[in-house]
Design a protein with these regions (language model features):
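Cationic, hydrophobic amphipathic alpha-helical membrane-interacting segments
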Residues: 1-112
Length: 112
């Protein structure tokens, strides 16, 4: 799983290109940290997946369209899981995984 510093470095590059996203970057970093430390395997794995996707996007292996499709699919899966989970777990999925995806998507769309 990508470290907090690796994610921060990826997002700092995005901030240099698009200064308006700094508050989104701060929120993403905090939410990513929460997801990595969550007791639920699914939440931790989703955070790792999102981090890997961001790394591959930064390397140029995924373009913006690929990222949007990938993240929207992951968001749909997370919503299904949240809806089928116990209330407390569903709330954590919504506040971490779905929020991470929403921030990443908003940043991508804003960069287009």
């Amino acid at each position: 799983m990508a470290s907090i510093n690796e994610i921060r470095n990826l997002l700092t590059t995005a901030r240099a290109e698009h200064p308006i996203v700094s508050s989104a970057i701060a929120e993403f970093t905090q939410t990513y940290k929460q997801a990595r430390e969550d007791s639920d395997d699914g939440i931790r794995e989703s955070a790792a997946f999102i981090a890997r996707a961001l790394q591959e996007h930064a390397r140029g292996w995924l373009d913006n369209d690929d990222m949007i499709i990938l993240l929207e699919g992951q968001r749909d899966l997370a919503r299904l899981r949240a809806n089928n989970a116990q209330i407390a777990l569903g709330n954590r999925i919504r506040s971490t995984v779905i929020r991470l995806i929403d921030i990443a998507l908003a940043s991508l769309v804003g960069a287009l």
